[in-house]
Amino acid sequence: ANLSEQYQRGDLENLLALFDASAHMERGDKKQIRAEYGELFRNSENRALYIWDVAWSGDGKLTRGEGSYQARVLRKGDGSPQIRSGAVTIEVIQRNDKPLIVGLYHKADY
């Protein structure tokens, strides 16, 4: 299953399994990724993540994808979802023949 599927399911452990131990995002390391997505999943009824128009480039070790994203989150008790969209960068390495995310960065347009 991919990042968007685990995000939509709110499956924290399987989402985290897509990330390498050394993974980072804007606000910190894998511990921060766990904390932020855990809070989001606990406090939302419904989520969707769309990523498209990704252009991939790589140097053999690191593969970088740059594209667009939209996240829709319906928080518990809210009547309508919050929608954020913008640019996303995903950095991936191969470890034991498995792709793992080492960087996930997004910039919302609001």
Feature names for model-found ranges:
Residues 3, 15-16, 33, 92:
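Hydrophobic pocket/interface hotspot
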Residues 6-22, 26:
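Short, well-ordered alpha-helical segments enriched in acidic and aromatic residues
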Residues 22-25, 71-73, 107-110:
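Solvent-exposed loop/turn segments at secondary-structure junctions
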Residues 38-85, 89:
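Surface-exposed, charged secondary-structure patches
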